Structures are given as C-alpha cells and as structure tokens.
Amino acid sequence: MSAITITEAAQAYLAELLEKQSTPGIGIRIFITQPGTQYAETCIAYCKPGEEKVEDTAIALKDFTAWIDAVSEPFLEDAVVDYATDRMGGQLTIKAPNAKVPMVNEDSPITERINYYLQTEINPGLASHGGQVSLVDVVEDNIAVLRFGGGCQGCGMVDMTLKDGVEKTLIERIPELKGVRDVTDHSNKENAYY
C-alpha cells in the first residue's frame, strides 16, 4: 500500500472531474518529474484504462483508481492530496515533503550522501539563522570542501558550527568521511548572523 493520502474532499473533486471525461474506467496517475532533485514537481494526470504501467501501484478508491508511479513512490511518502474550498471555488493541493529529498543508502556515492545530510539535517538548523552550507567537492583523503552562505558567511561562530555541528554530524553519518574544510570568504560580514 502506498503511503500517499488522498483526502475525501480531493477524492470527491477528482471523481467529479473524471466523470466529465466520459471515459469508463478512467482514473488518475500521480508521479513526480525529476524526483529527488531541487527541480522535482508532483503531478496528477488523467489515466485512461491501459495507460497505467505494470510497475505502478494501484490504489482503489471509492469512485476511481489512483495509479502511483513506481519510480516516484518512495518520494511520495507522507504526501497528501487535498481539496480546499474558498470564496473563489476551490483548489486541489499536493503536498509532497519528500519529493525533493534524494534517496540515498550506504552504497550511494559519498557526494550524494553528503548532500543528503546537508539538505535534510544540517541546513534546516542553519536556516533559523538565515544560513546554509553546500558541498563544493570531496578531495583527497575524503575531505568534504564546503561553502557557507547567507547568515553563516562572515559569522563569528562559523568555526564552532563547522567543527561541532557540520563535521561531527557528517562523520557520524558517513564514517569514511575524514573531515571538512571551509572555503567561504568570511571577510564579507554584511549578512552575518553573529
């Protein structure tokens, strides 16, 4: 069973749209273009009988079937399709919090794993100070070269953040990583948090 939720309001709205198509057995197909990247977009399309793919997961709903694209399915974990009414009519919304999160495991290249932990664990904390960190490269001896930006650039606490936060977290998650190096120009203190 897929971990996507399609609310009753969304089901009713979609059933109404599908009925207007005058195609017996028509359903919807939910997929993500460029899943696991910053360009990911969650999509819903009509799916006539026979247009679904063998590897798709079928969700039998009250009035129609929703087909979930197999490649997109892990990225649709915790996704919610909803329909909210307002003065102007209503709007179908799709919230897919994992659409842009890359799927990694211990066999993934070290750069993918570093980027994954930067985006999912480290940057959310730095964002509270208006900052972020990105991977520039992985150099000899498995040293990650990083660049800070936003409120972290020029910040007086960046050395502590680098060693006690970023480096510690990355080495705990990626044992073959031996350390991190900062290549940020911290002389620009215009947006610095501290």
Swiss-Prot record:
Involved in iron-sulfur cluster biogenesis. Binds a 4Fe-4S cluster, can transfer this cluster to apoproteins, and thereby intervenes in the maturation of Fe/S proteins. Could also act as a scaffold/chaperone for damaged Fe/S proteins. Transmembrane segments: none annotated. Binds 1 [4Fe-4S] cluster per subunit. The cluster is presumably bound at the interface of two monomers. Homodimer. InterPro entries: Fe/S_biogenesis_protein_NfuA (IPR017726), FeS_biogenesis (IPR000361), FSCA_dom_sf (IPR034904), HesB-like_dom_sf (IPR035903), NIF_FeS_clus_asmbl_NifU_C (IPR001075). Keywords: 4Fe-4S, Iron, Iron-sulfur, Metal-binding. Its cofactor is [4Fe-4S] cluster. GO terms for biological process: iron-sulfur cluster assembly; protein maturation. GO terms for molecular function: 4 iron, 4 sulfur cluster binding; iron ion binding. This is Fe/S biogenesis protein NfuA. Belongs to the NfuA family. [4Fe-4S] cluster binds at residues 152, 155. Signal peptide: none annotated.
